């Protein structure tokens, strides 16, 4: 870039020197003095810019790429150093672990904390389980309504199995009838007696015949 700037300055200085030299020759023509100076200066500037752009493009194609690449590498080094992550900071837990507690004590403390947390959780779980068991155990025990219905059904079933007063009375009456029929019937007994007397009378001595 510095070389390109120096070339541009040299070209501009040469062009300006030529312009002023030509202006001295044109002093005899005062009408075209102002237009001639500005016109020539403008032409010279445009030509100088065109030449400098061409020279800059040629230098860039020849070796500017390598220079540009070197500049990038040189710029990347400080950027990489600047973007590098900071060194890892020592953790607070590591300090406590190294200074105050040994590995066994640290593990023991961790186990105690874990048991404490899980113990509260297990106690709550045990209380909930006990409550559920009580709820489930209540219907498993004697239900007063169900027990009362069962007792009433058993009484109903037990009543016909025992002596029914009406049925027992009918059975007793039938038994009395059967016993009465089995025993001596007074009417039938009287008829039988009379027939026996009739039969026994001719068998014995007839008082008239006798």
Curated annotation (Swiss-Prot):
Residues 136-210 are annotated as: 4 X approximate repeat CLE. Glycans are attached at residues 32, 59. It comes from the Eukaryota. A- repeats lie at residues 127-135, 148-156, 169-177, 190-198. The keyword Secreted applies. CLE- repeats lie at residues 136-147, 157-168, 178-189, 199-210. Residues 125-137, 144-158, 165-179, 186-200 have a biased composition (Basic and acidic residues). GO terms for molecular function: receptor serine/threonine kinase binding. This is CLAVATA3/ESR (CLE)-related protein 4D. It comes from Globodera rostochiensis.
